[in-house]
Amino acid sequence: MASFVDRVVLHVSGGTGGHGCVSVKREKFKPLGGPDGGNGGNGGDVILRVSAQTTTLLDYHHAPHRHATNGGPGMGDWRGGKNGETLILPVPDGTVVKTKDGEVLADLVGEGTEYIAAAGGQGGLGNASLSSQKRRAPGFALLGIEGESSDIVLELKSIADIALVGFPSAGKSSLIAAMSAARPKIADYPFTTLIPNLGVVQAGDVRFTIADVPGLIEGASEGKGLGHNFLRHVERCAALVHVLDCGTLESDRDPLSDLAIIEAELEKYAVDMSYAGVDGEVVPLNERPKLVVLNKVDLPDGKDMAEFVRPDLEARGYRVFEVSATSHEGLRQLGFAMAEIVQAARNAVQAAPPKVAPPVLRPRAVNESGFKIRREEKNLEPLFRVLGEKPVRWVKQTDFTNEEAIGYLADRLAKLGVETELFKVGAKPGDTVVIGEDDGVVFDWEPTMMAGAELLATPRGTDIRVADIGDRPTRSQKRDEQIERREAKAAARAELEAERKAGIWTESVSGRRAQAVKESHLDSGDDD
Protein backbone atom coordinates (compact mmCIF):
# COMPACT_ATOMS: atom_id res chain seq x y z
CA MET A 1 0.00 0.00 0.00
CA ALA A 2 1.27 3.46 -0.89
CA SER A 3 2.56 5.55 2.02
CA PHE A 4 3.52 8.66 0.04
CA VAL A 5 1.31 10.39 -2.53
CA ASP A 6 2.36 13.66 -4.14
CA ARG A 7 -0.44 14.16 -6.69
CA VAL A 8 -4.19 13.77 -6.26
CA VAL A 9 -7.38 14.98 -7.89
CA LEU A 10 -9.64 16.45 -5.22
CA HIS A 11 -13.39 17.00 -5.62
CA VAL A 12 -14.51 19.77 -3.27
CA SER A 13 -17.94 21.31 -2.67
CA GLY A 14 -18.91 24.20 -0.44
CA GLY A 15 -22.00 23.98 1.72
CA THR A 16 -25.38 25.14 0.44
CA GLY A 17 -26.87 28.25 2.03
CA GLY A 18 -30.02 27.85 4.11
CA HIS A 19 -33.38 29.11 2.82
CA GLY A 20 -34.96 32.25 4.22
CA CYS A 21 -38.12 31.94 6.31
CA VAL A 22 -41.61 33.31 5.60
CA SER A 23 -43.32 34.10 8.90
CA VAL A 24 -45.72 36.65 10.44
CA LYS A 25 -45.34 37.79 14.04
CA ARG A 26 -48.15 36.67 16.37
CA GLU A 27 -48.51 37.70 20.01
CA LYS A 28 -51.21 38.66 22.52
CA PHE A 29 -53.30 41.66 21.43
CA LYS A 30 -51.26 41.72 18.21
CA PRO A 31 -52.18 38.68 16.13
CA LEU A 32 -50.59 39.99 12.92
CA GLY A 33 -47.54 42.01 13.91
CA GLY A 34 -45.69 42.05 10.60
CA PRO A 35 -43.05 39.80 9.01
CA ASP A 36 -40.48 38.15 11.28
CA GLY A 37 -38.88 35.49 9.06
CA GLY A 38 -35.12 35.11 9.67
CA ASN A 39 -32.32 34.71 7.14
CA GLY A 40 -30.78 31.38 6.22
CA GLY A 41 -27.22 30.59 7.30
CA ASN A 42 -24.30 30.65 4.87
CA GLY A 43 -22.80 27.37 3.71
CA GLY A 44 -19.37 26.34 4.95
CA ASP A 45 -16.18 26.91 2.92
CA VAL A 46 -13.61 24.29 1.97
CA ILE A 47 -10.15 25.66 2.81
CA LEU A 48 -6.72 24.19 2.12
CA ARG A 49 -4.28 25.06 4.91
CA VAL A 50 -0.56 24.31 5.07
CA SER A 51 0.28 22.18 8.11
CA ALA A 52 3.73 21.15 9.29
CA GLN A 53 2.20 17.91 10.59
CA THR A 54 1.18 16.82 7.09
CA THR A 55 3.83 15.40 4.75
CA THR A 56 1.81 13.57 2.12
CA LEU A 57 -1.47 13.76 0.20
CA LEU A 58 -2.30 10.16 1.02
CA ASP A 59 -5.54 10.96 2.89
CA TYR A 60 -7.01 12.64 -0.18
CA HIS A 61 -5.95 9.72 -2.37
CA HIS A 62 -8.23 7.43 -0.34
CA ALA A 63 -11.04 9.97 0.17
CA PRO A 64 -11.00 12.48 -2.72
CA HIS A 65 -14.55 13.81 -2.21
CA ARG A 66 -14.87 16.52 0.44
CA HIS A 67 -18.00 18.55 1.23
CA ALA A 68 -18.55 21.33 3.76
CA THR A 69 -21.72 21.46 5.86
CA ASN A 70 -24.82 23.34 4.74
CA GLY A 71 -26.25 26.44 6.37
CA GLY A 72 -29.36 26.11 8.51
CA PRO A 73 -32.75 27.54 7.41
CA GLY A 74 -34.09 30.76 8.85
CA MET A 75 -36.85 30.63 11.46
CA GLY A 76 -39.63 32.81 12.78
CA ASP A 77 -39.18 35.47 15.45
CA TRP A 78 -36.28 36.94 13.45
CA ARG A 79 -34.05 33.92 14.16
CA GLY A 80 -31.32 33.35 11.59
CA GLY A 81 -30.10 29.95 10.50
CA LYS A 82 -26.78 28.53 11.67
CA ASN A 83 -23.81 29.02 9.36
CA GLY A 84 -22.20 25.88 7.99
CA GLU A 85 -18.87 24.88 9.51
CA THR A 86 -15.73 25.58 7.52
CA LEU A 87 -13.96 22.41 6.38
CA ILE A 88 -10.18 22.74 6.88
CA LEU A 89 -8.08 20.36 4.77
CA PRO A 90 -4.41 20.21 5.89
CA VAL A 91 -1.86 19.96 3.09
CA PRO A 92 1.95 19.69 3.13
CA ASP A 93 4.17 22.72 2.76
CA GLY A 94 4.91 23.22 -0.93
CA THR A 95 1.55 22.09 -2.32
CA VAL A 96 0.56 23.59 -5.67
CA VAL A 97 -3.15 23.86 -6.53
CA LYS A 98 -4.06 23.53 -10.21
CA THR A 99 -7.08 23.04 -12.41
CA LYS A 100 -7.40 19.88 -14.46
CA ASP A 101 -6.19 21.91 -17.45
CA GLY A 102 -2.96 22.77 -15.65
CA GLU A 103 -3.73 26.38 -14.67
CA VAL A 104 -2.00 27.27 -11.39
CA LEU A 105 -4.49 28.56 -8.81
CA ALA A 106 -2.28 28.81 -5.74
CA ASP A 107 1.19 27.95 -4.49
CA LEU A 108 0.91 27.12 -0.79
CA VAL A 109 4.22 27.78 0.94
CA GLY A 110 4.60 28.53 4.63
CA GLU A 111 2.86 27.30 7.77
CA GLY A 112 -0.76 28.48 7.95
CA THR A 113 -1.06 29.57 4.32
CA GLU A 114 -4.67 29.13 3.18
CA TYR A 115 -6.60 28.89 -0.06
CA ILE A 116 -10.38 28.76 -0.40
CA ALA A 117 -10.89 25.79 -2.70
CA ALA A 118 -14.71 26.02 -2.69
CA ALA A 119 -16.72 28.88 -1.18
CA GLY A 120 -19.97 28.15 0.61
CA GLY A 121 -23.29 29.34 -0.79
CA GLN A 122 -25.02 32.48 0.45
CA GLY A 123 -28.02 32.06 2.73
CA GLY A 124 -31.40 33.34 1.55
CA LEU A 125 -33.05 36.42 3.05
CA GLY A 126 -36.19 35.98 5.14
CA ASN A 127 -39.30 38.07 4.56
CA ALA A 128 -38.35 40.33 7.49
CA SER A 129 -35.21 41.43 5.63
CA LEU A 130 -37.16 41.87 2.39
CA SER A 131 -39.76 44.19 3.91
CA SER A 132 -39.66 47.90 3.13
CA GLN A 133 -41.96 50.92 3.20
CA LYS A 134 -43.52 49.87 -0.10
CA ARG A 135 -43.31 46.12 0.54
CA ARG A 136 -44.59 45.92 4.10
CA ALA A 137 -45.40 42.22 4.34
CA PRO A 138 -43.60 40.02 1.79
CA GLY A 139 -45.21 36.65 1.39
CA PHE A 140 -41.98 35.10 0.11
CA ALA A 141 -38.32 34.61 1.01
CA LEU A 142 -35.14 34.01 -0.97
CA LEU A 143 -33.66 30.55 -1.35
CA GLY A 144 -30.14 29.62 -0.32
CA ILE A 145 -27.54 29.24 -3.08
CA GLU A 146 -25.56 26.07 -3.65
CA GLY A 147 -21.89 26.21 -2.73
CA GLU A 148 -19.11 26.12 -5.30
CA SER A 149 -18.03 22.74 -6.65
CA SER A 150 -14.76 22.14 -8.43
CA ASP A 151 -12.23 19.48 -9.30
CA ILE A 152 -8.71 20.58 -8.42
CA VAL A 153 -5.32 18.93 -8.71
CA LEU A 154 -2.95 18.99 -5.74
CA GLU A 155 0.75 18.53 -6.50
CA LEU A 156 3.40 18.38 -3.81
CA LYS A 157 6.77 19.95 -4.53
CA SER A 158 9.22 19.04 -1.78
CA ILE A 159 10.70 21.89 0.24
CA ALA A 160 14.45 21.15 0.45
CA ASP A 161 17.63 23.23 0.31
CA ILE A 162 19.64 20.68 -1.68
CA ALA A 163 18.41 18.16 -4.25
CA LEU A 164 20.41 15.03 -5.08
CA VAL A 165 19.93 14.10 -8.74
CA GLY A 166 21.41 11.33 -10.80
CA PHE A 167 20.82 8.05 -12.59
CA PRO A 168 19.14 5.14 -10.83
CA SER A 169 21.46 3.21 -8.48
CA ALA A 170 23.96 6.09 -8.39
CA GLY A 171 23.93 5.93 -4.58
CA LYS A 172 21.70 8.89 -3.74
CA SER A 173 19.72 7.04 -1.07
CA SER A 174 22.92 5.68 0.47
CA LEU A 175 24.35 9.19 0.50
CA ILE A 176 21.36 10.75 2.28
CA ALA A 177 21.35 7.88 4.79
CA ALA A 178 25.05 8.43 5.51
CA MET A 179 24.73 12.22 5.94
CA SER A 180 21.48 12.36 7.94
CA ALA A 181 19.23 10.30 10.16
CA ALA A 182 16.94 9.44 7.24
CA ARG A 183 16.55 5.75 6.50
CA PRO A 184 15.35 5.37 2.90
CA LYS A 185 14.99 2.03 1.18
CA ILE A 186 18.33 0.94 -0.29
CA ALA A 187 18.87 -1.96 -2.71
CA ASP A 188 21.11 -2.91 -5.63
CA TYR A 189 18.51 -2.55 -8.40
CA PRO A 190 17.30 0.51 -10.38
CA PHE A 191 14.39 2.65 -9.20
CA THR A 192 14.57 1.44 -5.62
CA THR A 193 13.57 4.95 -4.56
CA LEU A 194 9.99 5.60 -5.65
CA ILE A 195 9.28 8.58 -3.41
CA PRO A 196 11.37 11.64 -2.47
CA ASN A 197 13.26 11.18 0.79
CA LEU A 198 14.13 14.16 2.97
CA GLY A 199 17.04 14.29 5.40
CA VAL A 200 18.33 16.98 7.77
CA VAL A 201 22.07 17.67 7.76
CA GLN A 202 24.03 19.63 10.38
CA ALA A 203 27.30 21.13 9.11
CA GLY A 204 28.85 23.43 11.68
CA ASP A 205 26.28 26.08 12.61
CA VAL A 206 24.23 25.55 9.45
CA ARG A 207 21.29 23.19 9.43
CA PHE A 208 19.67 22.33 6.10
CA THR A 209 17.59 19.69 4.33
CA ILE A 210 18.52 17.52 1.38
CA ALA A 211 16.11 15.65 -0.88
CA ASP A 212 16.82 12.32 -2.51
CA VAL A 213 14.99 12.56 -5.84
CA PRO A 214 14.20 9.23 -7.55
CA GLY A 215 16.55 8.30 -10.37
CA LEU A 216 16.36 10.10 -13.72
CA ILE A 217 17.02 8.63 -17.15
CA GLU A 218 17.27 10.02 -20.64
CA GLY A 219 13.87 11.37 -21.70
CA ALA A 220 12.71 12.08 -18.13
CA SER A 221 11.66 15.61 -19.13
CA GLU A 222 9.26 14.01 -21.62
CA GLY A 223 7.81 11.63 -19.05
CA LYS A 224 10.05 8.57 -19.46
CA GLY A 225 10.89 6.57 -16.39
CA LEU A 226 9.38 8.44 -13.45
CA GLY A 227 9.54 11.61 -15.56
CA HIS A 228 7.59 14.63 -14.42
CA ASN A 229 6.34 12.76 -11.37
CA PHE A 230 9.52 13.70 -9.52
CA LEU A 231 11.31 16.32 -11.58
CA ARG A 232 9.03 18.90 -9.96
CA HIS A 233 10.60 18.12 -6.59
CA VAL A 234 13.83 19.86 -7.63
CA GLU A 235 12.10 23.16 -8.47
CA ARG A 236 12.32 24.70 -4.99
CA CYS A 237 15.88 23.71 -4.03
CA ALA A 238 18.67 26.28 -3.69
CA ALA A 239 21.30 24.04 -5.30
CA LEU A 240 21.66 20.76 -7.19
CA VAL A 241 24.12 18.00 -6.39
CA HIS A 242 24.89 15.61 -9.24
CA VAL A 243 25.59 12.16 -7.85
CA LEU A 244 27.65 10.23 -10.44
CA ASP A 245 28.26 6.50 -10.25
CA CYS A 246 31.97 5.73 -10.62
CA GLY A 247 31.46 2.01 -10.09
CA THR A 248 28.88 1.25 -12.78
CA LEU A 249 29.30 -1.98 -14.70
CA GLU A 250 27.23 -0.87 -17.69
CA SER A 251 29.43 -0.56 -20.76
CA ASP A 252 27.53 2.37 -22.30
CA ARG A 253 27.69 4.54 -19.16
CA ASP A 254 30.36 6.67 -17.51
CA PRO A 255 30.22 9.71 -15.17
CA LEU A 256 30.68 12.26 -17.97
CA SER A 257 27.92 10.88 -20.19
CA ASP A 258 25.59 10.52 -17.19
CA LEU A 259 26.18 14.17 -16.27
CA ALA A 260 25.53 15.33 -19.83
CA ILE A 261 22.22 13.44 -19.98
CA ILE A 262 20.98 14.70 -16.59
CA GLU A 263 21.95 18.30 -17.42
CA ALA A 264 20.11 18.08 -20.74
CA GLU A 265 16.96 16.71 -19.08
CA LEU A 266 16.99 19.39 -16.39
CA GLU A 267 17.44 22.12 -18.99
CA LYS A 268 14.50 20.81 -21.03
CA TYR A 269 12.33 20.64 -17.93
CA ALA A 270 13.37 24.14 -16.86
CA VAL A 271 11.85 25.56 -20.06
CA ASP A 272 8.38 24.50 -18.85
CA MET A 273 8.82 25.93 -15.34
CA SER A 274 6.66 29.04 -15.03
CA TYR A 275 5.49 29.41 -11.44
CA ALA A 276 6.34 32.27 -9.13
CA GLY A 277 7.49 31.52 -5.61
CA VAL A 278 7.05 33.67 -2.57
CA ASP A 279 10.39 35.38 -3.18
CA GLY A 280 9.92 36.16 -6.84
CA GLU A 281 10.58 34.30 -10.08
CA VAL A 282 12.34 30.96 -9.66
CA VAL A 283 15.95 30.86 -10.84
CA PRO A 284 16.23 28.48 -13.82
CA LEU A 285 17.60 25.07 -12.91
CA ASN A 286 20.61 25.42 -15.20
CA GLU A 287 21.62 28.67 -13.44
CA ARG A 288 21.55 27.38 -9.86
CA PRO A 289 24.69 26.41 -7.94
CA LYS A 290 25.82 22.85 -8.65
CA LEU A 291 28.14 20.39 -7.01
CA VAL A 292 29.38 17.14 -8.53
CA VAL A 293 29.78 14.09 -6.32
CA LEU A 294 31.83 11.15 -7.62
CA ASN A 295 30.35 8.34 -5.56
CA LYS A 296 31.53 4.78 -4.83
CA VAL A 297 35.25 5.59 -4.72
CA ASP A 298 35.60 2.73 -2.23
CA LEU A 299 35.28 0.25 -5.11
CA PRO A 300 38.48 -0.90 -6.84
CA ASP A 301 37.61 0.68 -10.20
CA GLY A 302 35.69 3.57 -8.63
CA LYS A 303 38.74 5.45 -7.39
CA ASP A 304 40.47 5.17 -10.75
CA MET A 305 37.38 6.37 -12.62
CA ALA A 306 37.00 9.36 -10.27
CA GLU A 307 40.61 10.44 -10.73
CA PHE A 308 40.24 10.05 -14.49
CA VAL A 309 37.14 12.28 -14.94
CA ARG A 310 37.84 14.82 -12.18
CA PRO A 311 40.16 17.10 -14.21
CA ASP A 312 37.63 17.31 -17.02
CA LEU A 313 34.81 18.23 -14.62
CA GLU A 314 36.88 20.88 -12.85
CA ALA A 315 37.82 22.36 -16.21
CA ARG A 316 34.10 22.89 -16.85
CA GLY A 317 33.81 24.90 -13.62
CA TYR A 318 32.27 22.27 -11.33
CA ARG A 319 33.26 21.78 -7.71
CA VAL A 320 34.01 18.06 -7.48
CA PHE A 321 33.98 15.82 -4.41
CA GLU A 322 35.11 12.19 -4.28
CA VAL A 323 33.02 10.39 -1.68
CA SER A 324 31.91 6.99 -0.53
CA ALA A 325 28.54 6.57 1.12
CA THR A 326 29.71 3.21 2.46
CA SER A 327 32.99 4.27 4.10
CA HIS A 328 31.90 7.93 4.65
CA GLU A 329 35.01 9.13 2.84
CA GLY A 330 34.74 12.81 1.81
CA LEU A 331 31.29 13.34 3.35
CA ARG A 332 32.45 15.96 5.85
CA GLN A 333 33.90 18.20 3.12
CA LEU A 334 30.78 17.69 1.02
CA GLY A 335 28.52 18.67 3.92
CA PHE A 336 30.36 21.94 4.54
CA ALA A 337 30.29 22.78 0.83
CA MET A 338 26.51 22.27 0.80
CA ALA A 339 26.14 24.42 3.93
CA GLU A 340 28.14 27.22 2.29
CA ILE A 341 25.78 27.30 -0.70
CA VAL A 342 22.66 27.14 1.48
CA GLN A 343 23.85 29.95 3.75
CA ALA A 344 24.66 32.15 0.75
CA ALA A 345 21.17 31.57 -0.65
CA ARG A 346 19.56 32.44 2.70
CA ASN A 347 21.62 35.61 3.03
CA ALA A 348 20.55 36.68 -0.46
CA VAL A 349 16.90 36.23 0.47
CA GLN A 350 17.29 38.27 3.66
CA ALA A 351 19.15 41.07 1.86
CA ALA A 352 16.62 41.31 -0.95
CA PRO A 353 14.18 44.25 -0.72
CA PRO A 354 10.62 43.39 0.29
CA LYS A 355 8.52 42.43 -2.69
CA VAL A 356 4.93 43.21 -3.46
CA ALA A 357 2.60 40.32 -2.78
CA PRO A 358 2.01 38.27 -5.93
CA PRO A 359 -1.28 38.98 -7.69
CA VAL A 360 -4.22 36.66 -7.29
CA LEU A 361 -4.21 34.31 -10.23
CA ARG A 362 -7.97 33.94 -10.49
CA PRO A 363 -9.71 36.66 -8.46
CA ARG A 364 -13.29 36.07 -7.46
CA ALA A 365 -15.96 38.46 -8.69
CA VAL A 366 -17.09 40.74 -5.88
CA ASN A 367 -20.49 42.43 -6.32
CA GLU A 368 -20.26 42.27 -10.09
CA SER A 369 -23.05 44.45 -11.50
CA GLY A 370 -22.60 43.94 -15.22
CA PHE A 371 -24.36 41.50 -17.52
CA LYS A 372 -24.44 40.70 -21.18
CA ILE A 373 -27.05 39.32 -23.56
CA ARG A 374 -26.08 36.83 -26.25
CA ARG A 375 -28.37 36.08 -29.17
CA GLU A 376 -28.56 32.45 -30.26
CA GLU A 377 -30.65 30.28 -32.55
CA LYS A 378 -32.49 27.16 -31.42
CA ASN A 379 -34.80 25.21 -33.73
CA LEU A 380 -34.72 28.16 -36.15
CA GLU A 381 -36.15 30.37 -33.39
CA PRO A 382 -34.30 33.27 -31.72
CA LEU A 383 -33.08 32.71 -28.20
CA PHE A 384 -31.64 35.40 -25.93
CA ARG A 385 -29.26 34.28 -23.17
CA VAL A 386 -28.65 36.63 -20.23
CA LEU A 387 -25.25 36.11 -18.59
CA GLY A 388 -23.93 37.86 -15.51
CA GLU A 389 -23.15 37.24 -11.85
CA LYS A 390 -26.18 39.09 -10.48
CA PRO A 391 -28.94 37.78 -12.81
CA VAL A 392 -27.77 34.18 -12.41
CA ARG A 393 -27.56 34.51 -8.63
CA TRP A 394 -31.02 36.11 -8.43
CA VAL A 395 -32.55 33.27 -10.42
CA LYS A 396 -31.02 30.71 -8.05
CA GLN A 397 -32.53 32.59 -5.10
CA THR A 398 -36.07 32.63 -6.52
CA ASP A 399 -38.81 30.23 -5.45
CA PHE A 400 -40.68 29.71 -8.72
CA THR A 401 -43.65 28.16 -6.92
CA ASN A 402 -44.42 31.57 -5.43
CA GLU A 403 -45.91 34.15 -7.82
CA GLU A 404 -44.88 37.01 -5.57
CA ALA A 405 -41.26 35.82 -5.60
CA ILE A 406 -41.35 35.66 -9.40
CA GLY A 407 -42.65 39.21 -9.50
CA TYR A 408 -39.84 40.32 -7.19
CA LEU A 409 -37.33 38.73 -9.59
CA ALA A 410 -38.93 40.56 -12.51
CA ASP A 411 -38.63 43.87 -10.66
CA ARG A 412 -34.95 43.26 -9.91
CA LEU A 413 -34.14 42.35 -13.51
CA ALA A 414 -36.00 45.38 -14.84
CA LYS A 415 -34.20 47.67 -12.40
CA LEU A 416 -30.85 46.20 -13.49
CA GLY A 417 -31.69 47.09 -17.09
CA VAL A 418 -32.19 43.62 -18.53
CA GLU A 419 -35.54 44.50 -20.13
CA THR A 420 -34.13 47.63 -21.77
CA GLU A 421 -31.14 45.72 -23.11
CA LEU A 422 -33.39 42.98 -24.52
CA PHE A 423 -35.22 45.62 -26.54
CA LYS A 424 -31.91 46.91 -27.87
CA VAL A 425 -30.78 43.50 -29.12
CA GLY A 426 -34.08 42.94 -30.93
CA ALA A 427 -36.07 40.77 -28.54
CA LYS A 428 -39.82 40.70 -29.13
CA PRO A 429 -42.70 39.72 -26.84
CA GLY A 430 -42.99 35.95 -26.71
CA ASP A 431 -39.31 35.28 -27.48
CA THR A 432 -37.42 32.77 -25.37
CA VAL A 433 -35.07 34.24 -22.78
CA VAL A 434 -32.64 32.07 -20.81
CA ILE A 435 -30.86 33.38 -17.73
CA GLY A 436 -27.64 31.44 -17.18
CA GLU A 437 -25.68 28.87 -19.13
CA ASP A 438 -26.95 25.46 -20.25
CA ASP A 439 -28.72 24.84 -16.93
CA GLY A 440 -30.32 28.30 -16.92
CA VAL A 441 -33.97 29.17 -16.34
CA VAL A 442 -36.16 29.64 -19.43
CA PHE A 443 -38.76 32.44 -19.73
CA ASP A 444 -41.28 33.41 -22.37
CA TRP A 445 -40.50 37.10 -22.33
CA GLU A 446 -43.30 39.65 -21.99
CA PRO A 447 -42.04 43.22 -21.46
CA THR A 448 -44.86 44.35 -19.19
CA MET A 449 -45.43 41.14 -17.24
CA MET A 450 -42.41 38.87 -17.22
CA ALA A 451 -43.36 35.29 -16.36
CA GLY A 452 -46.87 36.44 -15.36
CA ALA A 453 -45.61 38.42 -12.42
CA GLU A 454 -48.08 41.28 -12.99
CA LEU A 455 -51.08 38.96 -12.68
CA LEU A 456 -50.87 39.03 -8.90
CA ALA A 457 -54.14 39.93 -7.16
CA THR A 458 -52.38 42.26 -4.74
CA PRO A 459 -49.33 44.48 -5.01
CA ARG A 460 -46.03 42.60 -4.67
CA GLY A 461 -44.90 42.27 -1.10
CA THR A 462 -48.27 42.82 0.59
CA ASP A 463 -50.28 40.58 2.88
CA ILE A 464 -54.00 41.46 3.08
CA ARG A 465 -54.18 40.27 6.67
CA VAL A 466 -51.39 42.59 7.74
CA ALA A 467 -52.31 45.40 5.36
CA ASP A 468 -55.82 45.67 6.88
CA ILE A 469 -54.29 46.44 10.25
CA GLY A 470 -53.29 49.92 9.12
CA ASP A 471 -56.89 50.71 8.01
CA ARG A 472 -58.55 50.06 11.39
CA PRO A 473 -60.29 53.10 13.04
CA THR A 474 -58.52 54.99 15.79
CA ARG A 475 -59.92 55.60 19.30
CA SER A 476 -61.10 59.10 18.46
CA GLN A 477 -62.87 57.79 15.37
CA LYS A 478 -64.60 55.12 17.42
CA ARG A 479 -65.68 57.74 20.01
CA ASP A 480 -67.14 60.01 17.31
CA GLU A 481 -69.03 57.08 15.78
CA GLN A 482 -70.48 56.18 19.19
CA ILE A 483 -71.66 59.75 19.79
CA GLU A 484 -73.34 59.80 16.37
CA ARG A 485 -75.20 56.57 17.15
CA ARG A 486 -76.42 57.91 20.49
CA GLU A 487 -77.66 61.15 18.91
CA ALA A 488 -79.47 59.20 16.18
CA LYS A 489 -81.13 57.00 18.79
CA ALA A 490 -82.24 59.97 20.87
CA ALA A 491 -83.74 61.61 17.77
CA ALA A 492 -85.67 58.41 16.96
CA ARG A 493 -87.11 58.26 20.47
CA ALA A 494 -88.19 61.90 20.33
CA GLU A 495 -89.93 61.27 17.01
CA LEU A 496 -91.82 58.29 18.47
CA GLU A 497 -92.92 60.33 21.46
CA ALA A 498 -94.22 63.15 19.22
CA GLU A 499 -96.22 60.68 17.11
CA ARG A 500 -97.75 59.08 20.22
CA LYS A 501 -98.86 62.44 21.59
CA ALA A 502 -100.45 63.34 18.24
CA GLY A 503 -102.58 60.17 18.49
CA ILE A 504 -101.18 58.64 15.34
CA TRP A 505 -100.94 55.17 16.98
CA THR A 506 -102.31 53.51 20.10
CA GLU A 507 -100.32 52.41 23.13
CA SER A 508 -100.23 48.76 21.98
CA VAL A 509 -98.94 49.77 18.57
CA SER A 510 -96.54 52.14 20.27
CA GLY A 511 -95.21 49.27 22.37
CA ARG A 512 -94.67 47.08 19.34
CA ARG A 513 -93.09 49.97 17.41
CA ALA A 514 -90.75 50.76 20.29
CA GLN A 515 -89.80 47.10 20.59
CA ALA A 516 -88.96 46.99 16.86
CA VAL A 517 -86.84 50.13 17.16
CA LYS A 518 -85.03 48.64 20.15
CA GLU A 519 -84.30 45.38 18.30
CA SER A 520 -83.01 47.29 15.28
CA HIS A 521 -80.61 49.21 17.51
CA LEU A 522 -79.49 46.00 19.18
CA ASP A 523 -78.77 44.49 15.76
CA SER A 524 -76.68 47.53 14.86
CA GLY A 525 -74.41 46.87 17.86
CA ASP A 526 -75.64 49.67 20.16
CA ASP A 527 -75.22 48.79 23.84
CA ASP A 528 -77.84 51.28 25.10
From Swiss-Prot:
- Ranges where the Obg domain occurs: 2-159
Which amino acid positions bind GTP, per UniProt? 166-173, 191-195, 212-215, 295-298, 324-326
InterPro entries assigned to the protein according to its UniProt record, in alphabetical order = G_OBG (IPR031167), GTP-bd (IPR006073), GTP-bd_Obg/CgtA (IPR014100), GTP-bd_prot_GTP1/OBG_C_sf (IPR036346), GTP1-OBG_CS (IPR006074), GTP1_OBG_dom (IPR006169), GTP1_OBG_dom_sf (IPR036726), OBG_GTPase (IPR045086)
GO biological-process terms attached to the record: ribosome biogenesis
Segments forming domain OCT: 363-447
The record's annotation in Pfam families points to: DUF1967 (PF09269), GTP1_OBG (PF01018), MMR_HSR1 (PF01926)
Cofactor or coenzyme needed: Mg(2+)
A single GO cellular-component term from the record reads: cytoplasm
Where is this protein primarily located? cytoplasm
Q: Which domain of life is it from?
A: Bacteria
Question: EC number(s) on record?
Answer: 3.6.5.-
Mind listing the UniProt keywords for this protein, alphabetically?
A: Cytoplasm, GTP-binding, Hydrolase, Magnesium, Metal-binding, Nucleotide-binding
Which residue intervals make up region (Disordered)? 471-490
Under the heading SUPFAM superfamilies, the entry gives: Obg GTP-binding protein C-terminal domain, Obg GTP-binding protein N-terminal domain, P-loop containing nucleoside triphosphate hydrolases
- Record domain OBG-type G: where: 160-343
Repeat: is it a keyword of this entry? no
Q: How does it assemble?
A: Monomer.
Regarding protein family, the annotation reads:
Belongs to the TRAFAC class OBG-HflX-like GTPase superfamily. OBG GTPase family.
Report the function annotation for this chain: An essential GTPase which binds GTP, GDP and possibly (p)ppGpp with moderate affinity, with high nucleotide exchange rates and a fairly low GTP hydrolysis rate. Plays a role in control of the cell cycle, stress response, ribosome biogenesis and in those bacteria that undergo differentiation, in morphogenesis control.
State the protein's name: GTPase Obg
Which species?
Paenarthrobacter aurescens (strain TC1)
Source taxonomy lineage?
Answer: Bacteria, Bacillati, Actinomycetota, Actinomycetes, Micrococcales
Gene behind this chain?
A: obg
